[in-house]
Amino acid sequence: MKQSVSAEQIELKSSLPGSKKVYVDGPREGMKVPMREIEQSETNGVPNPPIRVYDTSGPYTDPEYKVELEKGIPTPRHSWILGRGDVEAYEGREVKPEDDGVKVASKHTPVFPQMDRKPLRAKQGANVTQMHYARNGIITSEMEYVAIREGVEPEFVRKEIAEGRAILPANINHPEAEPMIIGRNFHVKVNANIGNSAVSSSIAEEVEKMTWATRWGADTIMDLSTGKNIHTTREWIIRNAPVPVGTVPIYQALEKVNGIAEDLTWEVYRDTLIEQAEQGVDYFTIHAGVLLRYIPITAKRTTGIVSRGGSIMAQWCLFHHKENFLYTHFEEICEIMKQYDVSFSLGDGLRPGSIADANDEAQFSELETLGELTKIAWKHDVQVMIEGPGHVPMHLIKENMEKELDICQGAPFYTLGPLTTDIAPGYDHITSAIGAAMIGWFGTAMLCYVTPKEHLGLPNKDDVRTGVITYKIAAHAADLAKGHKTAHQRDDALSKARFEFRWRDQFNLSLDPERAMEYHDETLPAEGAKTAHFCSMCGPKFCSMRISHDIREYAKENDLETTEAIEKGMKEKAEEFKEAGSHLYQ
């Protein structure tokens, strides 16, 4: 008897304080685009409008939704995919025990109950990628959906995808995903990595981490599982994921050959690509730029090759003294990708793992190859984004962005940070968010989060929260710096609430309302403190904002401009000082 992953075992449903789920009707029947609406209280009887913000949480924050993990979440894209008439259902490959890294299927593994569903693929001769549609002048339902989320015209979305400046990762076998876009002319996105390892985590925990990450604002999820039950864990995640899901297929392929890199073959890897594409993975990290001739260059590095995928392929290349089979079979990979609309995330297997190695010959040699591969993928109308570093000091960050835009013809950049210093284990979410904010400002389209556990261990649920929030700050700061037309609205609303001492509105408008309230209540827990005109930092006498209010009130009472009120008040105080005898200490 197979076990099940019960929703009661883990925390899935939740909402953020002062918020409600709302839906914007799209141009097609039944299209409903989710937003989160943050209510605000009045200011002296004058209403403050609610603020609508981008929402990644899926149905889990909808009070009307009943969580049934065994059924998966709704599939808003299913009718759109079938309606285009260019896909077919087929039997698909047989799921084998080795897909989960075992010789014999375990009775205790909670297999997803709808494993008998038939996958979809493109009909013979068809190409079902969003890039293919865009290049043929077609605005898809997914593009219309994205346009509403981003506050732009559908034609702008189509053009950005057609020209390769943005990707809309949307595997036809992941109809549960709410369409989103990754490109430098849209909101900066954040990816959260989850996944088990050989020594830690369960299927239930990974499903919970996925919903937890999206609750806090993760735009995509990467399942980087390397332990047992890789296939089954991924199935549970995808069927319940409202955001695109990415993977690094070489990890699972390695498990299929018992962890021995030199035993990898193109056939095993190809089978793994098809397996994951049939499940609904939206983008693959593929380390096709780690070429045999680049590997010796890394020998003089401080930290060598730090990418798991990069080191696996380097080991294979050296053992066989052959060129990377991901590079030599790249056209065949493109043929698979366009049958399912899986996007490339071209991996930076030679990224620097220390600031000493930043912007070195190995890193930029690989980038040149990724530019070459981008052109090949685009020839097949397959969507591409480029992965970037890594560890880079602040003064070298801009060069990375400029080179990527030039060499990779403007394809979206997707970076891990970068970390701006190597001396802060336990705080690498901060060292990397500094670099992430900078490179996001310069044009990076998506930031891969870093948690406090980076370099130390597998992140838990709280680490995921910290990592996502830290990177939402970096992404939002970049949006502000780039002048995104709606980015400042939430900042302005929170600043107004702060100045008016609307404490609950301050909490609710923040990226992490619960943490903000928790910190406030540590020193001022009483309910009355939620309306007080001070906090515990300065107290009632020294609150700068309360003093500002007093100045404004004084100006109003004396029919003065604020600057005049300050001058008048200063003169009055000067006279008081003279009348008291002009003594410094009374």
From Swiss-Prot:
This is Phosphomethylpyrimidine synthase. Binds 1 [4Fe-4S] cluster per subunit. The cluster is coordinated with 3 cysteines and an exchangeable S-adenosyl-L-methionine. Its cofactor is [4Fe-4S] cluster. One of its GO terms (cellular component) is cytosol. The gene is thiC. Pathway: Cofactor biosynthesis; thiamine diphosphate biosynthesis. Substrate binds at residues 193, 222, 251, 287, 307-309, 348-351, 387, 414. [4Fe-4S] cluster binds at residues 535, 538, 543. Catalyzes the synthesis of the hydroxymethylpyrimidine phosphate (HMP-P) moiety of thiamine from aminoimidazole ribotide (AIR) in a radical S-adenosyl-L-methionine (SAM)-dependent reaction. NCBIfam families: PRK09284.1 (NF006763), PRK13352.1 (NF009895), thiC (TIGR00190). Zn(2+) binds at residues 391, 455.
